[in-house]
Amino acid sequence: MAPVPVTASNLNTSHSEAIFSAAKALMPGGVSSPVRAFKSVGGQPIVFDRVKGPYAWDVDGNKYVDYIGSWGPAICGHAHPEVISALQEAIEKGTSFGAPCALENTLAEMVIEAVPSVEMVRFVNSGTEACMSMLRLIRAFTGRDKIIKFEGCYHGHADMFLVKAGSGVATLGLPDSPGVPRSTTANTLTAPYNDLESVKQLFAENPDAIAGVILEPIVGNAGFIQPEPGFLEGLRELTKENGALLVFDEVMTGFRISYGGAQAHFGVTPDLTTMGKVIGGGLPVGAYGGRKEIMEMVAPAGPMYQAGTLSGNPLAMTAGIKTLELLKQPGSYEKLTATTERLIQGILDAGREAGLPITGGSVGAMFGFFLCEGPVRNFEEAKATDSVRFGLLHRAMLERGVYLAPSAFEAGFTSLAHSDENIDATIQAFRDSFAAIS
């Protein structure tokens, strides 16, 4: 059978288009987060109606195999029946207490048991909030102001982090954001990912001034970029030598590439860790944690102030507890890894069969590819990917019932709900789509 042409007429999205058209008069760009607007892939965004397991349905009734998973939280599959059941029971007791609840203890114990660096943890409501709070904490603990981040790494939309950031900033081609004072970013130093020499130079140029180094241990907001052997270990040594703290932003990798996150997978323990996504089971959540002596600086135990109305709310705690219980079941990560490895290998093979330059990889339940020759070791090399062709690919995959992240600079996610049949169908869809756009 000849490949289906990549045309809008092959997929009825009239209701999505009508809803999005109305949304543009109500919300900036018609969305609540920029990447959802399909700016980098073209066309109208798909408006979802419901999700279940590995699938999403739009308001026009089209069904997709979903590889975004709500941007990472849905590692057990959307609307897992055990998570839904636990939430139904919890919601009868109230949606938010604004007071301590025992569920916080339970989830905190699970996080501390799982994540090597975490001796104490504070729950917040988003990854951005976790990273913002962590930044204040490392400055308070060290008495220093400067930080080092890496080009293409995204740590939320707080002012200090919007310097050579990834995620939506990379998608829109913006180096930073209007409204961020130069005085705020003057203390943010940047280095290319996987470049230890640049980090050494920054420490040499800023003696006794750098509070910490923060990074995504696997970059998922500038595509999918893995640390080269020795990079994370080198950062651990450099921070210790210079009296700075090492922070892993595991909002994306936490509980996704292994139960203990990237730090357990790679065997490198930072001083502090930020988390989100998976630990809330699909509800808004964030967390930061680390060594007890550092965390005890957080109010009310210490002087560093941070608070939140909905932090530790019983619904997010309930969903997080049940999700981690499901992930602890024997064989969960073996299944996730095998599923993801088979998927990415099929994608790479399909691209090469079509004569396209392609490179990529996976770790645990996280994967990504670039439409360029590899390897891709940093954000500058990632920018060589063919974004125009990716836009065509994205549309072609929608036509074939597969929902990918609407950006060439975002990682993809699998779940326990993705079956062998889902993977087979997805690989065939890639074959057909690559053939259609090559």
Swiss-Prot record:
NCBIfam families: hemL (TIGR00713), PRK00062.1 (NF000818). It holds the Pfam family Aminotran_3. The keyword ATP-binding does not apply. It is found in: Cytoplasm. The keyword Transmembrane helix does not apply. Keywords: Chlorophyll biosynthesis, Cytoplasm, Isomerase, Porphyrin biosynthesis, Pyridoxal phosphate. Its cofactor is pyridoxal 5'-phosphate. InterPro entries: 4pyrrol_synth_GluAld_NH2Trfase, Aminotrans_3, Aminotrans_3_PPA_site, PyrdxlP-dep_Trfase, PyrdxlP-dep_Trfase_major, PyrdxlP-dep_Trfase_small. It comes from the Bacteria. It catalyses: (S)-4-amino-5-oxopentanoate = 5-aminolevulinate. GO terms for molecular function: glutamate-1-semialdehyde 2,1-aminomutase activity; pyridoxal phosphate binding; transaminase activity. This is Glutamate-1-semialdehyde 2,1-aminomutase. The modification N6-(pyridoxal phosphate)lysine is found at K277. Pathway: Porphyrin-containing compound metabolism; protoporphyrin-IX biosynthesis; 5-aminolevulinate from L-glutamyl-tRNA(Glu): step 2/2; Porphyrin-containing compound metabolism; chlorophyll biosynthesis. Homodimer. Gene3D superfamilies: Aspartate Aminotransferase, domain 1, Type I PLP-dependent aspartate aminotransferase-like (Major domain). It comes from Synechococcus sp. (strain CC9311). GO terms for biological process: chlorophyll biosynthetic process; protoporphyrinogen IX biosynthetic process. The lineage of its organism: Bacteria, Bacillati, Cyanobacteriota, Cyanophyceae, Synechococcales. Its EC number is 5.4.3.8. One of its GO terms (cellular component) is cytoplasm. Belongs to the class-III pyridoxal-phosphate-dependent aminotransferase family. HemL subfamily.
